[in-house]
């Protein structure tokens, strides 16, 4: 992947899980989102500065189209990587992750994909770290995130960059400029979640596919 190349990142997940809020945390400066009316898509240019140079993601956001059924193939075509997002306070949004993954891989096949559980700032968490195993079945990465607090915002993008470059040594040399947090996280709770995520990764996978 050349440094100047722009990367198409497909962002999918149920309506209301926080996809647009997440992508709009990044203050893109001179780059403005553009709307593609034929697909009902907003494309957000997100720039990250790494030890391998500038990385330019064009993040394709559904702009609510997922509420009207499946997305058109044109949304996925030529996708270089993807984020599947669910809401940790909504079990159904996690149960629907396999459907989004199936749609993605049907069109894009072998692209790097990150699974993100959003809204970990909300106290009433329904989907516990120990229940999140889909990513392990399909060799995806997983991160707890919180769009409203910027928690772990950059991690999915750094992981995707490392996969696209084929180099695990990717790091940010400059933190992205983000909107000010709208909520303050409980640091003790986040530490607990991080431990639970790490502990869950060491457990054997359940034999059935019904994670919840």
From Swiss-Prot:
The lineage of its organism: Eukaryota, Amoebozoa, Evosea, Eumycetozoa, Dictyostelia. Residues 33-41 are annotated as: Switch-I. One of its GO terms (biological process) is ribosomal subunit export from nucleus. PANTHER family: GTP-BINDING NUCLEAR PROTEIN RAN, RAN GTPASE. This is GTP-binding nuclear protein Ran. InterPro entries: P-loop_NTPase (IPR027417), Ran_GTPase (IPR002041), Small_GTP-bd (IPR005225), Small_GTPase (IPR001806). One of its GO terms (cellular component) is pathogen-containing vacuole. GTP binds at residues 14-21, 64, 118-121, 146-148. Found in a nuclear export complex with RanGTP, exportin and pre-miRNA. PROSITE patterns: RAN (PS51418). Residues 3-167 form the Small GTPase Ran-type domain. GO terms for molecular function: GTP binding; GTPase activity. It is found in: Nucleus. It comes from the Eukaryota. GTP-binding protein involved in nucleocytoplasmic transport. Required for the import of protein into the nucleus and also for RNA export. Involved in chromatin condensation and control of cell cycle. Transmembrane segments: none annotated. It comes from Dictyostelium discoideum. SMART domains: RAB, RAN, RAS, RHO.
